[in-house]
UniProtKB/Swiss-Prot annotation:
Stated family: Belongs to the peptidase M17 family.
Domain of life per record: Bacteria
GO biological process entries: proteolysis
Co-factor requirement: Mn(2+)
MF annotations from Gene Ontology: manganese ion binding; metalloaminopeptidase activity
Designated name of the protein: Peptidase B
Localization terms from the record: Cytoplasm
Keywords linked to the UniProt accession: Aminopeptidase, Cytoplasm, Hydrolase, Manganese, Metal-binding, Protease
Reported function: Probably plays an important role in intracellular peptide degradation.
Root EC class: hydrolase
Binding partners and assembly: Homohexamer.
């Protein structure tokens, strides 16, 4: 084992020999990070990425100034999808160390799950991983049901079945109930719905390779929302919450769904499929119908839903949509408290009407006349939320995954959003 490289924090500028703008320097004891009070967490994260890039795989966070957020910022930048890294953590009080350990367990689970190859992580494996994580943190407070394959069709989960039927790996719906009250009749405070497309080829509206090569990550919404529930539980969540993960492959085969197909949903809506690559909304619709039936105070869905959201925000922000201004502001306040980036994008009543079909009530994609793709996707989902004006948040997870490394992140999953959603769930 190599000797650990000591990483210390300093509020003094680097020696002039390192340059006027140096944010880190090397000394006899190791590496010093020079904080300037402007963006200390970002500075630490970017420095950690550089340290990893230097091939230093064993570090000790030493000296004064470290806390949970600073240690976590270092790990966020230091962690990568290849190889092993060892960190000797700074001395923290019990509460801070517990918080750090829970982040390391749960948010690393999210990142590792999203990074897993599609060959290893099919719909059933994703659902089971979620069950294992949540049972691990909540034990007997969790119960669940897994419905898959033809059972979905027989129970009229036709959006999920339609999308997933083209794969040899059957589609799966995980319905999980976290009930810490011990009362089977306790009201459901929140329902969480996640898109779990474990590989998205685009179906017959096939993607080009440049857009398909990262589609193992199209289950990022399901992983993020699962991690958020687990993390909220570690922070003391004492209300009943239900989780719905809509898991499927979107592949091409003789049994795959086709353009022009019409899906009949349980809430009476009919949807014409005019783009098989707009499949995420089709599976989420089934989860949102179940969520609405619980009459919760809060519904949150999370999905890597549209390229339009990434075009607007890049990979730095998650996109937020809601008709409920007060609730949207609460989510944004939670994001600020957790140092995570969310940005609200427009969602208006007219977006619900920008999905015309000649053969069904809705089209699953907007036409060229309605180019606001992220907003029309959110508008589509609203048709499956009973009281869409109040208590519903849609998160288009633009910041879930990066195809290549940048100065603060390795390539792959980020884990962003977990803490914000958990904060919102435990804020009241």
């Amino acid at each position: 084992m190599t000797e650990a490289m000591k990483i210390t924090l300093s509020t003094l500028p680097a020696d002039a020999r390192w340059g006027e703008k140096a944010t880190w320097s090397i000394n006899n004891d190791g590496i010093a990070l020079h904080l300037n009070g402007k963006d200390d967490l970002g500075l630490i994260q970017r420095a950690a990425r550089k340290i990893d890039g230097m091939g230093i795989k064993h570090v000790a966070l030493s000296g004064e100034g470290w806390n949970t957020d600073r240690a976590w910022a270092f790990w966020a930048g230091y962690k990568g999808p290849k190889g092993q890294r060892q960190v000797e953590w700074p001395t923290l009080d019990d509460a801070q160390r517990s918080e750090l350990d829970n982040r390391l367990t749960i948010i690393d689970w999210v990142r590792d799950t999203i990074n897993a190859p599609a060959e290893e992580l099919g719909p059933e494996q994703l659902a089971q991983r979620a069950v294992d994580l949540l049972c691990g943190v909540a034990g007997e407070k969790v119960s669940y049901r897994i419905t898959k394959g033809e059972d979905l069709r027989e129970q009229n989960y036709l959006g999920l079945h339609t999308v997933g039927r083209g794969s040899e790996r059957p589609p799966v719906l995980l319905a999980l109930d976290y009930n810490p009250t011990g009362d089977k009749d306790a009201p459901v405070y929140a329902c969480l719905v996640g898109k779990g497309i474990t590989f998205d080829s685009g179906g017959y509206s096939i993607k080009q390779s440049a857009f398909m090569d990262s589609m193992k990550s199209d289950m990022g919404g399901a992983a993020t929302i699962t991690g958020a529930l687990a993390f909220a539980i570690t922070r003391g969540l004492n209300k009943r919450v239900k989780l719905y993960l809509c898991c499927a492959d979107n592949l091409i085969s003789g049994n795959a769904f086709k353009l022009g197909d019409i899906i009949h949903y349980r809430n009476g809506k009919t949807v014409e499929v005019m783009n098989t690559d707009a499949e995420g909304r089709l599976v989420l619709a089934d989860g949102l119908i179940d969520a609405s039936a619980q009459k919760p105070a809060l519904i949150i869905d999370a999905a890597t839903l549209t390229g339009a959201a990434k075009t607007a925000l890049g990979n730095d922000y998650h996109a937020l949509f809601s008709f409920d201004d007060a609730l949207a502001n609460r989510l944004l306040a939670s994001a600020q408290a957790e140092n995570e980036a969310f940005w609200r994008l427009p969602l208006a009543e007219f977006h619900r009407n920008q999905l015309p079909s000649n053969f069904a009530e809705l089209n699953n994609t907007g036409s060229a006349a309605y180019p606001a793709g992220a907003s029309t996707a959110a508008g589509f989902l609203s048709h499956f939320v009973e009281n869409y004006h109040q208590g519903w948040l849609h998160i288009d997870c633009s910041a879930t995954y990066r195809k290549s490394a940048v100065e603060q992140w390795s390539a792959g999953a980020t884990g962003l959003g977990v803490r914000t959603i958990a904060n919102l769930l435990t804020a009241e």
